[in-house]
Amino acid sequence: MAPAMQPAEIQFAQRLASSEKGIRDRAVKKLRQYISVKTQRETGGFSQEELLKIWKGLFYCMWVQDEPLLQEELANTIAQLVHAVNNSAAQHLFIQTFWQTMNREWKGIDRLRLDKYYMLIRLVLRQSFEVLKRNGWEESRIKVFLDVLMKEVLCPESQSPNGVRFHFIDIYLDELSKVGGKELLADQNLKFIDPFCKIAAKTKDHTLVQTIARGVFEAIVDQSPFVPEETMEEQKTKVGDGDLSAEEIPENEVSLRRAVSKKKTALGKNHSRKDGLSDERGRDDCGTFEDTGPLLQFDYKAVADRLLEMTSRKNTPHFNRKRLSKLIKKFQDLSEGSSISQLSFAEDISADEDDQILSQGKHKKKGNKLLEKTNLEKEKGSRVFCVEEEDSESSLQKRRRKKKKKHHLQPENPGPGGAAPSLEQNRGREPEASGLKALKARVAEPGAEATSSTGEESGSEHPPAVPMHNKRKRPRKKSPRAHREMLESAVLPPEDMSQSGPSGSHPQGPRGSPTGGAQLLKRKRKLGVVPVNGSGLSTPAWPPLQQEGPPTGPAEGANSHTTLPQRRRLQKKKAGPGSLELCGLPSQKTASLKKRKKMRVMSNLVEHNGVLESEAGQPQALGSSGTCSSLKKQKLRAESDFVKFDTPFLPKPLFFRRAKSSTATHPPGPAVQLNKTPSSSKKVTFGLNRNMTAEFKKTDKSILVSPTGPSRVAFDPEQKPLHGVLKTPTSSPASSPLVAKKPLTTTPRRRPRAMDFF
């Protein structure tokens, strides 16, 4: 038994949805012929189910088409099928089944395929208007067509997706103006927008109301007073040439000027949706929109009355009434504005021209005023500049007079000693260079203070060398040498006077100048040479030693103790050990307290080493700086020897056991005293390269064995180790850690062994 033949509609649907383009193209051509043949009779033809099957095949025929140009061609071919239907009833059914298919399949369309279906909807709507146009815009056909649209798209019961509905509202007036803009009258256009008036008045969807208001009614308001483009261009050229006077400009021309920008916005709104026509056909080579045809004509008063009638019903929601009332007012204003005489428009235009002339005159006046202001400002600036130059010249003359006085009061010194007066001369030129100012603050200030401290008659005439601060001066970091010189100059001059008065240890300079001593000292400091007795300045004693004892007396034990901590403090301040400079203390109390503290520290150290006391007493007995430098070198060698573990002295371990035999052989006193030495602010570095502790071996597996016995306890706070890591040596000679290296006068000690370090 042969299988039953499938209906033709199903076969067309299968071939239309084929993946091969040739099969689809042949199916579309045969479908056109099939529709034309089947609808030749006035009654009958296709049923709704048959047309739904055909439209489903056409929908998926559009689905599988991928290239944009081919998509546009296929969409136009599908839209032209409505003209193949010879029966008017079949035509409306064909259009109705199209909207039903789009409503059913819309939610399954992905984002990449939306554009071609937007284009398909636009072209089908355009061809639907073409059907009405070919039938002469018959009212019966218009009514049936609008009923189909109302039922399948706009009505809430249609369950049409918002994408289909909103796109239909956006393109409705655009496609209607393209097809019937030249033929349709205001009454006919009112019938075409009547479904939107009904839906906007009774729907409860606020978004739909707003979309209808913007896409239909506000678009009508925006394009309201337009005239054909040919007359518009002619009138524009005439107005530009000045052939027409203000009274001869027609009413439409005035409204046209105001609505040129609105036309562009309306066209932009009509092409807002993404579709193939707006992308490819909507623009020509110059980038402008294609000709949309003549604009639709509307009776604004009739539109306002129709909206007022719909909103005056009791079942109209408040939101819809409020939104539509604004549109009603706009349409009423447009209807009233169309009856204004041409004279009023001419007066408005003349007033606008007068305003433009006045504004141009104001701009010219403002430009002249600005030029005058700039000229006045230039003149004022030149005057101010001249006054400033005069002031600067007068100030320079005054400064030069002061400099002459200073030159008469201060004698010149050759060589580097003359740096201070030259820098004082530059003090008057502070605005000229900030670098000289910084040098003046660093060098000239100690020299000025030294001259004022000599007590001669020139001290009263010289102002104190205080650095003048300026806001624009760059902050410069002072060198440590300049900082120490400032401190020395602040402390030393009265003490130098006390020394030079009774003892006469400060002779005058080579020319007897009051500042010669300070400048010579400065020059020698720069050269890095310390003067010895008999050449220039003698080495001054330390300030705390001058207060307690005579500077020229023999060295005593306490003074020798105080020199060592002061030398250590000086060593911290210095960058290198080769230069010997004075150290100024802030006050006498702090110096005495620090001195006493250091005396206690050094007394403990000297008790254990008698040689240190004899060596520390030599520098002051000699009275020269060479012994101080040798003492400092010995001190540094002693500290470095302690760090390198050259002496067998060992620190007290954290965990240790007392050696039984060590009590009888070695007295514990010195060791305890050495361990109890108070902490000082000295910096200690340890030479870890001599560390001989056993290195941990990664291959040692003893730690992997779990312990047994009492050591299995996780944590016992009372448990103590059996022995410490560091062990006290049983027989190690006790000696001081700070003993300086000297020639061995006694029997040499034995060489330390490895057991002495553990």
Curated annotation (Swiss-Prot):
The lineage of its organism: Eukaryota, Metazoa, Chordata, Craniata, Vertebrata. The keyword Transcription regulation applies. Its main location: nucleus. One of its GO terms (cellular component) is preribosome, small subunit precursor. InterPro entries: RRP1. Residues 259-272, 397-408, 469-481, 566-575 have a biased composition (Basic residues). Transmembrane segments: none annotated. This is Ribosomal RNA processing protein 1 homolog B. Induction: By DNA damage. Interacts with the transcriptional activator E2F1. Interacts with serine/threonine-protein phosphatase PP1 subunits PPP1CB and PPP1CC but not with PPP1CA. Interacts with 60S ribosomal proteins RPL5 and RPL27, ribosomal processing protein RRP1/NNP1 and other nucleolar proteins including NOP2/NOL1 and FBL. Also interacts with nucleolar protein NPM1/B23. Interacts with splicing factor SRSF1 and with LUC7L3/CROP. Interacts with GTPase activator SIPA1. Interacts with CBX5/HP1alpha, H1-10, NCL, PARP1, TRIM28 and YBX3. Belongs to the RRP1 family. It comes from Homo sapiens. Residues 447-457, 498-513 have a biased composition (Low complexity).
